[in-house]
Amino acid sequence: MNKIINDKKNKKTFLDKLSVLTVHSIPIFIILTSVLFVFSFKPLYYFDIDHLDLVRVTGYSKELIARNYNYVVDYCLSPINTNFNLPDLPSSNNGITHFKDVKKLLQNLIKINFLFLFTSIYGIIYTIKKEKYEYFKLVSVNIFLVPVLLSIPFALNFYKSFEVFHKIFFRNDYWLFDSTYDPIISILPEEFFFHSAVFILVILILFSLVFYFFYQKLKDSLYVKKGSNNERDDRNTITGSKSKS
């Protein structure tokens, strides 16, 4: 009998620990979602075409710039394996290989993010069901730490941060484009990637604030609920005492 009770207790402890792990997956899901969203958010680039005066800088028309940028984004986000072939601009073998590597990286991130989507949903349900709202505060803090920590190297030397990023995620230096052989790089200036990084950090800050807002609201509702239960228990106690007397 004791063995059965202990087994049930151990199983419950394991499930609770597993559930807590799903809560910790929420910040990862938010970060990956923010990265994928910004990569696919073409209006930011359209804004930069004018803001960075790319037509004058590159000598290409606005339509050509947008068309080739759209191709790069669509190619990288598409799960279908096709040959990389820009509509208007030539590409070197190294350039083609790099975009294939980017596509592979993004496709892996998308698959991983689907996994974190389900674990995050479970984590949110677990947090609300068990009324462990302090987990939402923890999620908020963890998300907020990312922009805080990344903003420092970005502000000090964004190019160096950009270089470190490529060295971490790519095994070669094919990302170092020569505009003579890969003119696509001329329409993808460093400033655009900086704006994209800032956009990601802003989104993360907003998500952090949203989770903290939920934490405060749910915590307050829990206090109200506990207060109501205590008042009801007090009334029942008083009623019971009167009945005995």
What kind of feature is each model-predicted range?
Residues N2-Y45:
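Hydrophobic secretory-pathway targeting helix
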Residues S120-F162, V210-R232:
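Juxtamembrane interface at the cytosolic side of transmembrane helices
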Residues I26-I31, I110-I128, S196-L222:
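Transmembrane alpha-helical segments in integral membrane proteins
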